[in-house]
UniProtKB/Swiss-Prot annotation:
This is Nuclear export protein. Signal peptide: none annotated. Pfam families: Flu_NS2. The keyword Transport applies. GO terms for cellular component: host cell nucleus; virion component. Keywords: Host nucleus, Host-virus interaction, Transport, Virion. One of its GO terms (biological process) is exit of virus from host cell nucleus through nuclear pore. The keyword Transport applies.
Length: 121
């Protein structure tokens, strides 16, 4: 895993946790939780790829890993749409920059997960 990606996740999560979006703070907390979950999932896939041949172990641990992979892609798509929406409605430049960086990170992570999953298939 790229150390820049790790610091990007940490930076964006820290920035998002500092935002005060009024009534939508509950939604923002949900986004933060999903970002953290996505990071952990991406990391676990990356570790499995690093141990090449770990597909059988991955399948034994979680017989529904393809279903889980599909669910993660749905979460990524939802997060991308949510971040795009927030980017459109916010007028605060700090929030705009944070959401633009979050969007870029989501797109990068989506590509990484696709790459990892193809290597495991």
């Amino acid at each position: 895993m790229d150390s820049n990606t790790v610091s990007s996740f940490q930076d964006i999560l820290m920035r998002m946790s500092k935002m005060q979006l009024g009534s939508s703070s509950e939604d923002l907390n949900g986004m933060i939780t999903q970002f953290e979950s996505l990071k952990l999932y991406r990391d676990s896939l990356g570790k499995a790829v690093m141990r090449m041949g770990d597909l059988h172990s991955l399948q034994n641990r979680n017989g529904k890993w393809r279903e889980q992979l599909s669910q993660k892609f749905e979460e990524i798509r939802w997060l991308i749409e949510e971040v795009r929406h927030r980017l459109k409605v916010t007028e605060n430049s700090f929030e705009q920059i944070t959401f633009m960086q979050a969007l870029q990170l989501l797109l990068e992570v989506e590509q990484e997960i696709r790459t990892f999953s193809f290597q495991l298939i």
